[in-house]
Design a protein with these regions (language model features):
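Catalytic Walker B motif of ABC-type/P-loop ATPase nucleotide-binding domains
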Residues: 155-159
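ABC ATPase nucleotide-binding domains
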Residues: 227-254
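ABC ATPase NBD coupling module
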Residues: 66-80, 85
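Conserved ABC transporter NBD signature motif
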Residues: 56-66
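The feature captures the beta-strand-to-loop junction immediately N-terminal to the Walker
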Residues: 34-36
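Conserved ABC ATPase "signature" region
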Residues: 109-124
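Helix-to-loop junction immediately C-terminal to a conserved catalytic motif
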Residues: 49
Length: 254
């Protein structure tokens, strides 16, 4: 296995956000990390990427290298991470934000330009980052991660599709699939289970800080099990997973 997590525990102060997670994944795959709010999804992937600020125990190895003991710079050479909320304090253009990849690992202008094209942000490149919409900002920081990322590396995405319209989601999903096809391992936190079903090869299901299930998409994304875990009824139509929306109209005042 390319990525091996052994007995991972993560704390927020005195509270355990992740408890004893052991799981693995191969390169060339897309792994969706799912679960309800507060289940430990983001804490887990941040710990894997080495950016979680709290205390953590256990080990993470990537291609045989112990990431738990690696320096931030060494880790960044093999692991690129995108947070769910883009934060750029300086007054940069989108192109300058993407070029920040060169502050982590040596990168040429060609790396930056390829990332710009891969995420379809050339029309945004010279605009102020702060003036972009939420979905546009997310695509720009994803392009920065792609500029930093070496094919065959580990890419960790925490809810990357938030604030994106359908066309933006489609563009990013296509880029993620291309990276996996080229040998990268992509971990992606998702709330949209239909998107997880369409995009991922494997699924890690977090529940109350523990790994409830992991394995191939078709076995973990079982409609009956998801209904019990999420409190929402699911069904498969033509092989695709979708939630069943049942109207609940409470009496209105007056």
């Amino acid at each position: 296995m390319s990525l091996v997590i052994d007995s991972m525990c993560v704390w927020h102060g005195a509270r355990a956000a992740v408890q004893g997670v052991s799981v693995s994944a191969r390169a060339g795959r897309i792994v969706a990390v799912i679960g309800r709010n507060g289940s430990g999804k983001s804490s887990l992937v941040r710990a894997i990427a080495g950016v979680h600020p709290g205390r953590r125990t256990g080990s993470t190895s990537w291609r045989g290298r112990d990431l738990s003991a690696a320096s931030a710079l060494d880790r960044a050479r093999g692991v690129a991470y995108v947070a769910q909320r883009p934060l750029v304090a300086a007054d940069f253009t989108a192109r300058e934000v993407i070029a920040l990849a060169g502050a982590v690992v040596p990168r040429t202008t060609e790396h930056v330009e390829r990332a710009i094209d891969a995420l379809g942000v050339r029309d945004l490149a010279d605009r102020p980052f702060a003036a972009l919409s939420g979905g546009e900002q997310q695509r720009v920081v994803l392009a920065r991660a792609l500029a930093q990322h070496d094919l065959g590396g580990l890419l960790v995405l925490d809810e990357p599709f938030n604030a994106m319209d359908l066309a933006e989601q489609h563009r990013v999903a296509g880029a993620v699939q291309c990276l996996a096809s080229a040998g990268s391992l992509v971990l992606v936190v998702l709330h949209d289970l239909a998107l997880a079903d369409a995009l991922a090869h494997e699924v890690w299901w977090m529940d109350a800080g523990r790994l409830r299930a992991s394995g191939p998409r078709e076995s973990v994304l079982d409609a009956a099990a998801l209904g019990q875990g999420f409190g929402v009824r699911f069904e498969r139509v033509g092989g695709s997973l979708r939630p069943v929306i049942a109207p609940r109209c409470e009496p209105l005042p007056g």
